[in-house]
Amino acid sequence: LAEKEENTNAQAIALTMKALYLSNMTDLFGDMPFKEAFKGIEENIMQPKFDDQKVIYDSLLMDLERANTLYTKTSTIDAKRDLLYNGDVTKWRKFTNSLYLRLLMRVSNRRDMNSAERIKTVFENPSQYPIFESNDDNATLKYSGTRPFVNDFGDNATDDSAMGERFINIMVDSSDPRISVYCNRVSSGANAGGYVGITSGAPASVISKQSADGASNSNNTTFRQYTSPYTFMTYSEVLFIKAEAI
């Protein structure tokens, strides 16, 4: 529809969100249906073949490169329909190129991807590749708290999940101050007052014992409110990429 209407900004946004979600999927699952995916109705492809992860990354990187060239200030984005950046074309373009950096960093150990040179090109050419410059550029979706614009995880519950042991141990061992933002201290049991996680994938008997002793759950005041924002990417991630790549 965006192509039919020659709306290049909408095309660029669509390519950006496609790269965001499909990169998350291939990071989780590796090889997956890609070229033949989403063609069940149009082409009757009910069992799409799996594509190599390199093929997927190459395609997504090209999508982001194309998206960067499609943005234009000669046409506007309807702010009422843009829940992420309220119609700000410049911020969308910054998000596209910052996401481009993330994907390049993901494959930085693959020499054939030439990530180092491509990342350097982005940082050295801000006019051609604008990227996040402050927290004001963060790709953060804010919810009003009124349905349907509510956080899907916003149920205020505190007792239906437990934090993973490895995650908790890493934060405790490094005295990471963000731990109180992510989760709560154990309220009762042998582990009361501390930050303790559950062993992922452990037998039911082990998990039952750990649960009885007490485990930390997610902090419902920060992540599980109906108005809790959802962040896709931040300025701090761009700074980490810059520190590691240059």
Regions found by a protein language model. Give the residues of each.
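Structured, solvent-exposed acidic/aromatic patches
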Residues: L1-M17, Y21-I246
